[in-house]
Amino acid sequence: MKMDAYNAVGIAEGFVEAESEEQVIEAWQYLHDTGLGYQLQGFFGRTLQRLIEGGYVHA
């Protein structure tokens, strides 16, 4: 699946099924890299912060 805004948000919210755990991380990395994750509701920014602190998403 090509990662774009729709798929990244869909995977993060659970209405698009990820093909693997790696794709879930790819979706969150996309949301961080594009800044979209910080423009959406607070859940996204808080989750990104935890994923960065855990070393799953690279800042």
Feature roles, as predicted:
Residues 1-59:
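Catalytic phosphate/metal-binding cores of nucleic-acid and nucleotide-processing enzymes, i.e., regions
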